[in-house]
Amino acid sequence: MDRKEMISMILAGGQGSRLGILTKKLAKPAVPFGGKYRIIDFVLSNCSNSGIYTVGVLTQYKPLELNSHIGIGTPWDLDRRDGGVYVLPPYQEESGGNWYKGTADAIYQNISFVDNYNPEYVIILSGDHIYKMNYANMLKFHKEKKADVTIAVIEVPIEETYRFGIVNTKSDMEIYEFQEKPMKAKSTKASMGVYIFKWTLLKRFLKADQSDKNSSNDFGKNIIPNMLNSGIKMYAYPFRGYWKDVGTIQSLWEANMDLLKEDNELNLGDLNWRIYSVNHVEPAQYIGPKANIKSSIAVNGCEIYGEVKNSIISSGSIIGKNSKIIDSVIMPYSKIGDNVIINKALVGSNVVVRKNSIIGDGREITVIGSNKDIKAESLLVSS
């Protein structure tokens, strides 16, 4: 097997508990996004567009739909004989198997997979972030700095630093301190969960971490601090572009709404950096004679007979006559009946909302889980 300069390992096993009923039956990276995508499509597309064609996807929680979506990687040009995409569930030993105990443990359990390719570098990625990034540029930075580890960082508002791992750097971006979700941060450089490591170095620290019974087996809590304490040369790679951790209902709704802005940074129409997904064969969208659509995305296969404003109507969904969809996301194959008002909501896949119902009041985000059947004349408002 030819040696790879760099392979990627995507952490995609998260339960996504903060997304509530949207992840009751599927992993967070498999949640629909933007009308025709799933969240994991972004990191897979980034790998392909960056020339990384050997990809391990580490799954765990409710993996069936995610595994089916990824398949052999054809939509992302990852169905290759020399490389490809591999779904890696928790390792099963003769004595039984355990779930991944943490992000570092997930990589540790797959050391043999990485060793098969004998890469010089490994890039560790999260499968639940929305962004477009050229990892080849980050690797170039890593080499120029002669770094052992490089962490991609993005500037965040000071009031949000408590949600992230925060890096403190010298003027040349060398990292001298890492604060995991600090109450009082010293900088606003937040880790994006994108790491490049020299593989031999990372493997050594993973094995040492595994032998520490008090470790959480986590990159942010254990591996990165341990490396810094050992004097490992670590740099921060500044990323300037759109990036969103869609781990909450609020952030998922915001990321979808961001797509509807005229000057949206993500720009899914950019032909130079396409976001690929599984393309189901759908008929063209149908817009009824009395439909009214404004500042919205309506994907192939949907039918719209009512009013849609600042919303996303996903593939295969139907909006009934005299219905109003405002500031909302209707996920794939949902059926909205006649005379329904949906205002500031996330409606899951395969949902039926029957006639004369009201969903949401435009203040808090109302969420309806997948496969729900909302009876006629219902009133559902987030409390």
From Swiss-Prot:
Similarity section: Belongs to the bacterial/plant glucose-1-phosphate adenylyltransferase family.
Alphabetized NCBIfam families for the sequence: glgC, PRK05293.1
GO biological process: glycogen biosynthetic process
Pathway: Glycan biosynthesis; glycogen biosynthesis
GO molecular function, one term: ATP binding
Enzyme Commission numbers on file: 2.7.7.27
Protein name: Glucose-1-phosphate adenylyltransferase
Residues the entry annotates as binding alpha-D-glucose 1-phosphate: Y100, G165, E180, K181, S191
Quaternary structure, from the entry: Homotetramer.
Gene3D superfamilies: Hexapeptide repeat proteins (2.160.10.10), Spore Coat Polysaccharide Biosynthesis Protein SpsA, Chain A (3.90.550.10)
PROSITE patterns: ADP_GLC_PYROPHOSPH_1, ADP_GLC_PYROPHOSPH_2
Keyword Zinc: no
Provenance organism: Clostridium kluyveri (strain ATCC 8527 / DSM 555 / NBRC 12016 / NCIMB 10680 / K1)
Reactions that this protein is recorded to catalyse: alpha-D-glucose 1-phosphate + ATP + H(+) = ADP-alpha-D-glucose + diphosphate
Family matches, as InterPro entries: ADP-Glc_PPase (IPR011831), ADP_Glu_pyroP_CS (IPR005836), GlgC_bac (IPR023049), GlmU/GlgC-like_hexapep (IPR056818), NTP_transferase_dom (IPR005835), Nucleotide-diphossugar_trans (IPR029044), Trimer_LpxA-like_sf (IPR011004)
Function: Involved in the biosynthesis of ADP-glucose, a building block required for the elongation reactions to produce glycogen. Catalyzes the reaction between ATP and alpha-D-glucose 1-phosphate (G1P) to produce pyrophosphate and ADP-Glc.
KW Transferase (keyword) present: yes
Keywords: ATP-binding, Carbohydrate metabolism, Glycogen biosynthesis, Glycogen metabolism, Nucleotide-binding, Nucleotidyltransferase, Transferase
Gene: glgC
SUPFAM superfamilies: Nucleotide-diphospho-sugar transferases, Trimeric LpxA-like enzymes
Domain of life assignment: Bacteria
One Pfam family per UniProt: NTP_transferase
